[in-house]
């Protein structure tokens, strides 16, 4: 799929939202942001997703992470739809802004186009404070996102960033579980970086590349 991808800087577009107008880089500044698009207002899967984002808002807040939605409908449509979202989700308030893109000018620049349906996709970018894309998900219109996986992936990115990307998170990792040390870090460096110690897996190759440690 053409367009911006991992490591690319999100273009500093001026956007109109359900809150106000702003430039994307101003919104991204000094925090991580979950930027997510949906195929359309007043659609079933999207209603459940945006409601779940509202319900999980406290989880993003405590991580210092902002939310920002996007759809190819106008601001008034978004505001009317929010009433349905909040009613269906038992009052969870949609307090995050939703970008309006009725002319479909923004989604191509953010690489949020469904290549099969040639319309707005169910995409999600996790954007760092440097306005660069750190992770992307792209789902077909038939499949809703899993908020727990979004949080898990976000926690992984935050943990790696905290340790200058000298660690990585293994399969099915969750917070408070061991991480692995980057192969770029020598054992001598690892001893200094991780005074709590690390365990090297005893594998047939004897290459010593799989090292687990505890971090916080």
Curated annotation (Swiss-Prot):
Q: What InterPro entries does the record tag this protein with?
A: AhpC/TSA, Peroxiredoxin_AhpC-typ, Peroxiredoxin_C, PRX_1cys, Thioredoxin-like_sf, Thioredoxin_domain
Q: Which PROSITE patterns match?
A: THIOREDOXIN_2 (PS51352)
- Can you supply a Gene Ontology BP term from the record? response to desiccation
Q: Pfam families, alphabetically? A: 1-cysPrx_C (PF10417), AhpC-TSA (PF00578)
Keywords recorded for this protein, A-Z? Antioxidant, Cytoplasm, Nucleus, Oxidoreductase, Peroxidase, Redox-active center, Stress response
Kindly state the tissue distribution recorded for this protein.
Answer: Predominantly expressed in seed. Expressed in endosperm, embryo and aleurone cells. Also detected in young seedlings, abscission zones, stem branching points.
> Coiled-coil stretches, from where to where?
none
Give a Gene Ontology cellular component term annotated to this protein.
nucleus
Q: Where does the record place the catalytic residues?
A: 46
Among the GO molecular function terms of this UniProt record, one is: thioredoxin peroxidase activity
| Top EC class of this enzyme | oxidoreductase
Induction, per UniProt: By abscisic acid (ABA) and oxidative stress.
Q: What is its EC number?
A: 1.11.1.24
Q: Return the motif ranges for Bipartite nuclear localization signal.
A: 191-214
- Compartments, record wording: Nucleus; Cytoplasm
Catalytic activity field: a hydroperoxide + [thioredoxin]-dithiol = an alcohol + [thioredoxin]-disulfide + H2O
Cite the Thioredoxin domain residue spans from the record: 4-159
Q: What else is known?
A: The active site is a conserved redox-active cysteine residue, the peroxidatic cysteine (C(P)), which makes the nucleophilic attack on the peroxide substrate. The peroxide oxidizes the C(P)-SH to cysteine sulfenic acid (C(P)-SOH), which then reacts with another cysteine residue, the resolving cysteine (C(R)), to form a disulfide bridge. The disulfide is subsequently reduced by an appropriate electron donor to complete the catalytic cycle. In this 1-Cys peroxiredoxin, no C(R) is present and C(P) instead forms a disulfide with a cysteine from another protein or with a small thiol molecule.
Question: What functional role does this protein have?
Answer: Thiol-specific peroxidase that catalyzes the reduction of hydrogen peroxide and organic hydroperoxides to water and alcohols, respectively. Seems to contribute to the inhibition of germination during stress.
Family as reported in the entry's similarity comment: Belongs to the peroxiredoxin family. Prx6 subfamily.
Q: What is this protein called?
A: 1-Cys peroxiredoxin PER1
Q: Which organism is it from?
A: Arabidopsis thaliana
């Amino acid at each position: 799929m053409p367009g911006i991808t991992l490591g690319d800087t999100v273009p500093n577009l001026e956007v109109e939202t359900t809150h106000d107008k702003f430039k994307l880089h101003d919104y991204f500044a000094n925090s991580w942001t979950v930027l997510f698009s949906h195929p359309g207002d007043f659609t079933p899967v999207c209603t459940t997703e945006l409601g779940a984002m509202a319900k999980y808002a406290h989880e993003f807040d405590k991580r210092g992470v902002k939310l920002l939605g996007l759809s190819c409908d106008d601001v008034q449509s978004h505001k009317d739809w929010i009433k349905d979202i909040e009613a269906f989700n038992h009052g969870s308030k949609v307090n995050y802004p939703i970008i309006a893109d009725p002319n479909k000018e923004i989604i191509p620049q953010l690489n949020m186009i469904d290549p099969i349906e040639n319309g707005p996709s169910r995409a999600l970018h996790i954007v760092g404070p440097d306005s660069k894309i750190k992770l992307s998900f792209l789902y077909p219109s038939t499949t809703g996102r899993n908020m727990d996986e979004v949080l898990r992936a976000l926690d992984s990115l935050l943990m790696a960033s905290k340790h200058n990307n000298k660690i990585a998170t293994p399969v099915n990792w969750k917070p408070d579980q061991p991480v692995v040390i980057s192969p770029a870090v020598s054992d001598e460096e690892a001893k200094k970086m991780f005074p709590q110690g690390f365990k090297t897996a005893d594998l047939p190759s004897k290459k010593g590349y799989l090292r687990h440690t505890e971090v916080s």
